Swiss-Prot record:
GO molecular function terms listed in the Swiss-Prot or TrEMBL record: RNA binding
Major localization class: nucleus
Limits of the KH domain: 105-185, 240-322
Spans annotated as Required for nuclear retention: 455-523
A Pfam family matched in the record: KH-I_KHDC4-BBP
Coiled coil: none
GO CC field: cytoplasm; nucleus
Region (Disordered): 482-516, 543-585
InterPro entries: KH_1_KHDC4/BBP-like, KH_dom_type_1_sf, KHDC4_KH-I_first, KHDC4_KH-I_second, PRP5/DDX46/KHDC4_KH, RIK/BLOM7
Signal peptide: none
Protein known as: KH homology domain-containing protein 4
Assembly description: Interacts with PRPF19.
Length: 585
């Protein structure tokens, strides 16, 4: 096809005249593009200007130049390639490539270590969505650098290896501060959640921010904001648990760790420049997030701007805790060693009380020394000691009663209970003795009320002298002689009325002659005495009773106090005497 023909296709090859029009040093219109190639737009523009005769490839060159310029700008902005010197001298789009280079030199970089934060918090900070949110909020770029390392791996860390941290960079310090504060809030919330959950694997959030100042630039105004950025920096943090949660209550753990007036912790702060204080249960430190003490056991919180200072403060705190533990062990050993001695000192006091006399007489005997209340004495111990003292009585006993005379009580045919007189040494309870004394003291009143024997019949039926002789014989058997008893019996016979049978009338003069020497006043007194003594156990009088009394005289003298009485058959067989008319009731 000739050059003057009509329409041409883009596939048409240019003729020789067109090749002669190409200037030396001008790049071809279509060149292969590589990632590292750098196309200069001025050269492309010069080629377009010199190839005015060739109108076919002009559109393709413009498109290639535009694409190359865009790609070069993107690569320069990302730092993948560096612009050449001739390109900077022939800038047709002023301000783009030099602006990118200038922004890279003035970037403020900060690093936040998140290797030791709780797992949930670490996972949240390494997520791309969280980092994009922080970048949009602050305007600074956030990226993850390093890798997670355990304590053993940290000890064996290489020169080019670093623990996990966040890389923050921005145009100004304000943007970086904003991003760092947001990261701090996320870490703080994660620490509070971990403390609430009492995670045993959490050793405290160790957050370190390193501020990398910009290289030396002619602008000096960037230096003054440096202290402001450092004021918001995080410190390297760590904690040491005290480990005395179950200590004895008398051992004040907080005071032992802090020292007098917190002197121990203040000494560590002065030596290392770190911030050291107690936190956790029983520390008295109120957490700002929860408004109360932390749920964790008591621990020492340490923070320092540099890892070296943190290590020095941690070592001093470990030495302090070792001293506190040793002191607590000595305290516990002292308590366990003194406990048996304290318990052994008590038995001498108890034995001293038991050495006091345990018996006290019931009559209120007072000793010469203060009386110590002894334990309740056994009943068997009190019996042999009662013999020594008589029992006081509010009413004196009758004069005829001899307390130390023991005599058996005869069985009388009466319905009244017969008091038994026993020596005080054999009477155990006091109340029965009082009842006996009251009973014997009431007997004279009963005898006085029936002095003459007029109960329900005549005198010779009620005042015979053969009835109640228990008390009188018991009282006077040991004192009176046998002759006195015989005389009293004869007087009783003389004072009795004349019997109704002739036999008794014949014996009456003999009895009167035997007792004729007695006076009338003496007879009356004896009669009153005998009637007062003989009120119980009355027996009917018979004419022939004198013979029976003589037959039983020996028994009456020797054994009347032993409870002798006439057989009931003889008493029932005796006929009743006829009563004179003048003695009828």
């Amino acid at each position: 096809m000739s050059a003057g023909s009509g329409r041409r296709s883009k596939w048409d090859q240019p003729g020789p005249p067109t090749t002669t029009l190409l200037l030396p040093g001008v790049i071809p219109a279509i060149i292969p593009f590589t990632a590292g190639a750098f196309l200069s737009p001025p050269e492309i523009a010069a080629a377009d200007a010199t190839s005015e005769a060739v109108s076919a490839p002009s559109g393709a060159l413009d498109a290639a130049a535009a694409v190359a310029a865009k790609i070069n700008a993107m690569l320069v902005a990302k730092g993948k390639i560096k612009p050449s010197q001739n390109a900077t001298e022939k800038v047709h789009v002023p301000g783009k490539a030099p602006a990118a280079a200038k922004s890279k030199d003035d970037l403020v970089v900060a690093e936040v270590e998140i290797n030791d934060v709780p797992l949930t918090c670490r996972n949240l900070l390494t997520r791309g969505q969280t980092q994009d949110e922080i970048s949009r909020m602050s305007g600074a770029a956030v990226s993850t650098r390093g890798r997670y390392m355990t304590a053993e791996e940290k000890a064996k860390i290489g020169p080019g290896d670093r623990p996990l941290y966040l890389h923050v960079q921005g145009q100004t310090r304000e943007l970086v501060d904003r991003a760092v504060n947001r990261i701090k809030e996320i870490i703080t919330s994660g620490v509070v959640k971990a403390a609430t959950g009492s995670s045993p694997t959490f050793n405290g959030a160790t957050v370190t921010v390193y501020h990398q100042p910009a290289p030396v630039t002619p602008v000096v105004s960037a230096a003054p904001p440096k202290p402001q950025f450092q004021s918001g920096m995080h410190y390297v943090q760590d904690k040491l648990f005290v480990g005395l949660e179950h200590a004895v209550a008398t051992f004040n753990v907080k005071e032992k760790v802090e020292g007098p007036g917190c002197s121990y912790l203040q000494h560590i702060q002065m030596e290392t420049g770190a911030k050291v204080f107690l936190r956790g249960k029983g520390s008295g430190c109120i957490e700002p997030a929860s408004g109360r003490e932390a749920f964790e056991p008591m621990y020492i919180y340490i923070s320092h701007p540099k890892p070296e200072g943190l290590a020095a403060a941690k070592k001093l705190c470990e030495n302090l805790l070792q001293t506190v533990h040793a002191e607590y062990n000595r305290f516990v050993n002292q308590i366990t060693s003194t406990a048996p001695m304290t318990g052994y000192a008590q038995p001498p006091q108890i034995s001293s009380v038991s050495m006091q006399p345990q018996y006290y007489p019931p009559n209120g005997y007072q000793t010469g020394f203060p009386v110590v209340q002894p334990p309740a004495p056994q009943p068997a111990v009190q019996v042999p000691y009662v013999v020594s003292t008589p029992i006081a009585s509010p009413v004196p006993p009758p004069p005829g009663v001899v307390p130390n005379m023991a005599a058996p009580v005869p069985a009388v045919p009466t319905c009244y209970p017969i008091p038994q007189v026993q020596p005080p040494g054999l009477s155990l309870p006091v109340p029965p003795q009082g009842q006996k004394r009251r009973f014997t003291e009431e007997l004279p009143e009963e005898r006085d009320s029936r002095l003459l024997g007029y109960q329900h019949g005549p005198i010779h039926m009620t005042n015979l002298g053969t009835g109640f002789l228990v008390q009188s014989k018991m009282d006077g058997a040991s004192v009176r002689s046998d002759t006195v008893v015989v005389k009293e019996r004869e007087r009783d016979r003389q004072l009795m009325p004349p019997p109704g049978f002739p036999v008794s009338a014949q014996k009456e003069p003999e009895e009167k002659s035997a007792a004729g020497t007695l006076g009338v006043a003496e007879d009356n007194s004896i009669k009153k005495l005998k009637t007062s003594d003989k009120t119980f156990g009355l027996v009917a009088y018979a004419g022939d009773s004198s013979d029976e009394e003589e037959d039983h005289g020996v028994l009456k003298n020797s054994g009347w106090s032993a409870g002798y009485q006439y057989p009931a058959s003889q008493q029932q067989q005796r006929p009743k005497p006829q009563m004179p008319f003048w003695m009828a009731p």
